[in-house]
């Protein structure tokens, strides 16, 4: 999992990327390409 300050640029890298909020953190998850998983931090 990548940890980035800004997720906006990562969101457009793959069409299956989804932005989700869990426990006060912002994540990008991708069911088809797991390598695009990221967390804002």
From Swiss-Prot:
Q: Which cysteines are joined by disulfide bonds?
A: none
GO CC, sorted alphabetically, is: ribonucleoprotein complex; ribosome
Q: Which UniProt keywords apply?
A: Ribonucleoprotein, Ribosomal protein
Instruction: List the GO molecular function terms.
Output: structural constituent of ribosome
Which family does this protein fall into? Belongs to the bacterial ribosomal protein bL36 family.
Q: Which HAMAP family match?
A: Ribosomal_bL36 (MF_00251)
Protein name (record): Large ribosomal subunit protein bL36
Q: Which organism is it from?
A: Xanthobacter autotrophicus (strain ATCC BAA-1158 / Py2)
